[in-house]
């Protein structure tokens, strides 16, 4: 664990001279707090990666539920942005937290989709937590903080130099149970995130696209190399449910008594208090576990 020594955090280049007290004042001014590796509050899944950050500067609260990363190119198409937003909504409705990089294009739309559905979301920055980058996302960054957390390994005031972003991508994948790439060129940050996810043992998903479109080439290459293709929001939730399972909450953890004659799907959803993707996630997981069986529009007890 790195210690605060001689007015700086050991191992992180200082952005300005100052004492430890100055750093604490800067964090307070930024509304951030420092969470060190091994201390309470440090995200549980990060220590398992090869190179976890020794300190995280956090604004907001990191959600306790499993996270799913949805990432992609800044140079996105309207089609890709629509998919990213739909995926963000679906992830939130299923009960997971959305993680992304708060960048232009795919990242921003994924965050917006999660926020629209009232879900928790986490944005990982490649700069200080008090630096709005890109500037036009200042209000989005504030919304993400209110709904979840803004996280970075860089101290307040750190500028968004390009070389800082590839290292931050390991945090996006490290925080998440799975990584979904919506649109990506053959090179770029989204493919870095996918590569780090694979190294960390996370499942990688990708949206197939036009073979002649540059913004789809990265996704098509990922699928060629073994990533799981996803064809829409419902397909994504079904695949994620098989990989990580829905989070256990009072609603999704309950298995109501299902009569031998079965029960209509819509009636079961109402009894569970679940709607949309959240219900589909519960139903898919329950089928996998063998606790229910679906035939047409009715659900029966498992094992029959």
Predicted features, each with a name:
Residues 1-44, 289:
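Accessory alpha-helical DNA-binding modules that contact the DNA backbone or grooves
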